[in-house]
Each structure stands twice: as structure tokens, then as C-alpha cells.
């Protein structure tokens, strides 16, 4: 995952995925993800770990604290790919929805929230809907609405509270 030619990297990732999870493969990838100075190499390690089902909850929690917004955003996308991640990761994602300075990360959260269970997504959507700095973003308000829309049937009163307190134009 450190080769300069991306073709070799993608080919190696595919081979690793075909082989499946092996701790001897995951350990060097974890080291790259947590400590490599180049964000693109950390992303490649993240993708490879995900491909071999080696992205554990503790490792993902560390990746959600990465200094690079792309690593944080991709971690969110990969974690929510198949539904709800662990409760501790949901808490971390909710904290990022409230406090992350990056619009890219908040956009990834809004997009991923659509794949969360309705009860899990409401607090996340509520935090996103209150971000005044995203009101003029061309994507975040719509993605937030799409995520909220799926939760309305589960808890109409809570959804109404969230939507009435949003910082965006009327959703």
C-alpha cells in the first residue's frame, strides 16, 4: 500500500481481499494507518483493512481522530456501509457531527446517516441540522434531509423537533 504507482496498490488490495483476513497482513496495515505521515498512504491502508475485514472498532475509533479530513470521512463511510457500527463508534460519529470543523466530514456523516437505523440516526441528523455554517453548502442540507426523511416514520414527534430547529432553509 506504499507503492508510488496506484495500479500496483489497487492490484495488491484486490489480492489481499481475495485472501481474506490474516493478522500478519493486518498488523503492518494498522501501523501504516496510525502512523504514516502521508494521508494518501493512510487512506490506502484504511481501504485495504476494510477490504480484508480488518477494520476493528478500536482501530476505527483512532482513525476517526485522524488529523486528515479525508481519513475521518472515509472511515465514517466504511463504518456505516452495512448499517449501524458499535455504540461507541456511533457516539464518536455523533461527536464529529457536532464538533468537526470539516464540511467534508460532515457531508460524509450526512450521507452515511441514511444507512443508520432510524433511532440511531436522529441524534446525528439533529446535530447536523443545527450547523449554521452548512446552510449554504450545496449538498449537506439535502443529505441531512434525506437522512431525516427515513427516520420520520419511526418517531414523528422527534423528527418534527429536529426539523423545526434546523439551521438550514425550510426543509
Question: For the regions a protein language model found, what residue spans apply to each?
Answer:
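Long, ordered, helix-rich scaffold segments
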Residues: 1-171
Amino acid at each position: 500500500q506504499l507503492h508510488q504507482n496506484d495500479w500496483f496498490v489497487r492490484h495488491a488490495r484486490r489480492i489481499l481481499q481475495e485472501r481474506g483476513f490474516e493478522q500478519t497482513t493486518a498488523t503492518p496495515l494498522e501501523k501504516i494507518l496510525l502512523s504514516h505521515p502521508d494521508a494518501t498512504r493512510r487512506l490506502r491502508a484504511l481501504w485495504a483493512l476494510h477490504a480484508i475485514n480488518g477494520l476493528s472498532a478500536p482501530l476505527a475509533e483512532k482513525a476517526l481522530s485522524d488529523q486528515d479530513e479525508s481519513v475521518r470521512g472515509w472511515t465514517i463511510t466504511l463504518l456505516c456501509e452495512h448499517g449501524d457500527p458499535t455504540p461507541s463508534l456511533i457516539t464518536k460519529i455523533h461527536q464529529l457531527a457536532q464538533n468537526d470543523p470539516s464540511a467534508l466530514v460532515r457531508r460524509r456523516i450526512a450521507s452515511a446517516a441514511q444507512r443508520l437505523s432510524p433511532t440511531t440516526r436522529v441524534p446525528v441528523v439533529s446535530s447536523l441540522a443545527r450547523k449554521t455554517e452548512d446552510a449554504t453548502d450545496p449538498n449537506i442540507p439535502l443529505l441531512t434531509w434525506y437522512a431525516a426523511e427515513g427516520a420520520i416514520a419511526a418517531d414523528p414527534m422527534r423528527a418534527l423537533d429536529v426539523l423545526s430547529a434546523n439551521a438550514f432553509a425550510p426543509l
